[in-house]
């Protein structure tokens, strides 16, 4: 287990080697009940074995990273990532960003704010357009009340479900003892104008039954260079339910980018 000090914040990181000196692939996990392990157990290994160096990290307040009381807005997330790349010496060339769900939101925001840092984007069923900010804020507010009024972490621990107990305790701390919900509520959805400003290639991988697919189609229409890959038979949880198809799409895209750079 490694920690890296980035902009005064201790972030839990994990690196996997690649071959050669190609761009690093940085994975950004989802919100609240997630951490770097979701990628470590799915895409990170195959991507590393294909020759691409990998960086995973627990975002601010998640997993084994430090949990400050505030700073959960998108601009601060970009600053955290920028500081992390600098601390690891990975800011000298653009990196590939792979974001799942809200991690995709942060990856896209990074590409818009710091296009010099991003070689390409892979967005996995990320929330892009529509009323997702309000919907997610409402959902998390209800969850916060439920966690505050229950003893779920203790009950799970008593049943021997230690991993679930840790996740529940972390979610309780994030939702009830930080500004995460307030910071999320201040965000706005992306627009076609935002998509048109993207300077890097984008691969968007979505489930055929996902409620977020319309936003991905809008992205594909508006972005200068975007491939939309729709995986059949799954909804939002593409990373876990369609790992094989997702992995194939990601490796194909990374291989194509490596070939383009080499050529």
List where the protein language model places each region.
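N-terminal cap/lid segment of alpha/beta-hydrolase-fold proteins
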Residues: 1-10
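Conserved HGGG/HGGXW glycine-rich cap/lid loop of the alpha/beta-hydrolase fold
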Residues: 12-64
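Active-site loop/oxyanion-hole signature of alpha/beta-hydrolase fold enzymes
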Residues: 55-98, 248
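Gly/Ala-rich beta-loop-alpha elbow adjacent to hydrolase catalytic centers
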Residues: 99, 103, 107
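Flexible "cap/lid" loop of the alpha/beta hydrolase fold
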Residues: 108-112, 121-149
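Hydrophobic, aromatic-rich cap/lid helix
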Residues: 164-194, 208-209
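Conserved loop-alpha-helix segment in the C-terminal half of the alpha/beta-hydrolase fold
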Residues: 202-234
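Catalytic histidine-centered segment of alpha/beta-hydrolase-like enzymes
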Residues: 234-244
């Amino acid at each position: 287990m490694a920690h890296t000090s980035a902009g005064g914040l201790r972030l839990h990181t994990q690196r996997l080697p690649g071959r050669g000196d190609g761009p690093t692939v940085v994975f950004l996990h989802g919100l609240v009940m997630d951490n770097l392990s979701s990628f470590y157990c799915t895409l990170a290994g195959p991507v590393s074995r294909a020759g691409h160096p990998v960086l995973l990290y627990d975002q601010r307040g998640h997993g084994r990273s430090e949990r400050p009381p505030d700073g959960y807005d998108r601009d601060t997330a970009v600053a955290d990532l920028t500081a992390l790349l600098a601390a690891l010496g990975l800011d000298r060339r653009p990196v590939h960003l792979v974001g799942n769900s809200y991690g995709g939101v942060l990856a896209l925001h990074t590409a818009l704010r710091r296009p010099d840092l991003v070689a390409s984007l892979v967005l996995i069923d990320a929330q892009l357009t529509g009323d997702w900010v309000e919907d997610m804020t409402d959902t998390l507010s209800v969850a916060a009340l439920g966690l505050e009024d229950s003893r779920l972490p203790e009950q799970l621990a008593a049943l021997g479900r230690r991993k679930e107990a840790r996740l529940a305790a972390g979610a309780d701390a994030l939702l009830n003892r930080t500004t995460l919900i307030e910071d999320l509520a201040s965000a706005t959805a992306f627009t076609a104008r935002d998509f048109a400003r993207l300077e890097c290639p984008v691969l968007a991988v979505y489930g055929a039954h996902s409620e977020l697919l319309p936003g991905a189609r809008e992205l594909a229409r508006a972005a200068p260079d975007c491939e939309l890959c729709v995986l059949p038979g799954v909804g939002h949880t593409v990373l876990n339910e369609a790992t094989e198809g997702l992995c194939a799409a990601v490796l194909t895209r990374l291989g194509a980018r490596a070939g383009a750079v080499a050529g």
